Amino acid sequence: MSHYEGDLRPAGARFVIVCSRWNARITDALVAGACHSLVDNGVPDDAVDVVRVPGAWEIPIVANLLAQAGQHAAIIALGCVVRGDTRHYEHVADLCAEGMMSVQMQTGVPVLNGVLAVECIKDAEMRAGGSHGNKGAETALAALEMVSLLEKLP
């Protein structure tokens, strides 16, 4: 029986972080965490690109263009959507996730979902370097592992 599992060795891969500017204090911390994770695991600074988009809604179209361009082994999507008084939050968070899933299924390029969908800004703070860690860093580690795994699969 064969067993396949990715590791955290980048093997010369390029990565791109697509991050929303909305809730910048949170998203800046997510980007910093992702960059540190990549560099700490051997990815050179010049093998990481960062693309800023206005909000989470715009992440899938940019991820799609980048995936089709074929210059990156994985796309790390980061953002922060906070529940408000209307259902807008649900539409943005759900359709952003669906869009990212569609991109990776259609292109074969992993799109890792680090878009926070939280009840309040305090929840986001806890996930952007607070008591719940840094989800940007965790998403970058998942990207490293997926790139490695996809290279190993028959």
Curated annotation (Swiss-Prot):
Positions contributing to (2S)-2-hydroxy-3-oxobutyl phosphate binding: D85, T86, R127
Active site residues of this protein: H88
Binding-site residues for 5-amino-6-(D-ribitylamino)uracil, renumbered to this chain: W22, A56, W57, E58, C80, V81, V82, N113
Pfam family, one: DMRL_synthase
GO cellular component terms attached to this protein's record: cytosol; riboflavin synthase complex
Keywords attached to this entry: Riboflavin biosynthesis, Transferase
Top-tier EC class: transferase
Pathway: Cofactor biosynthesis; riboflavin biosynthesis; riboflavin from 2-hydroxy-3-oxobutyl phosphate and 5-amino-6-(D-ribitylamino)uracil: step 1/2
Catalytic reaction list: (2S)-2-hydroxy-3-oxobutyl phosphate + 5-amino-6-(D-ribitylamino)uracil = 6,7-dimethyl-8-(1-D-ribityl)lumazine + phosphate + 2 H2O + H(+)
One biological process term in Gene Ontology: riboflavin biosynthetic process
MF GO annotations: 6,7-dimethyl-8-ribityllumazine synthase activity
EC number(s) recorded for this UniProt protein: 2.5.1.78
Function: Catalyzes the formation of 6,7-dimethyl-8-ribityllumazine by condensation of 5-amino-6-(D-ribitylamino)uracil with 3,4-dihydroxy-2-butanone 4-phosphate. This is the penultimate step in the biosynthesis of riboflavin.
NCBIfam families, alphabetized: lumazine-synth
Oligomer status and interactors: Forms an icosahedral capsid composed of 60 subunits, arranged as a dodecamer of pentamers.
PANTHER family assigned: 6,7-DIMETHYL-8-RIBITYLLUMAZINE SYNTHASE (PTHR21058:SF0), 6,7-DIMETHYL-8-RIBITYLLUMAZINE SYNTHASE DMRL SYNTHASE LUMAZINE SYNTHASE (PTHR21058)
Family: Belongs to the DMRL synthase family.
Listed name of the protein: 6,7-dimethyl-8-ribityllumazine synthase
This protein's encoding gene: ribH
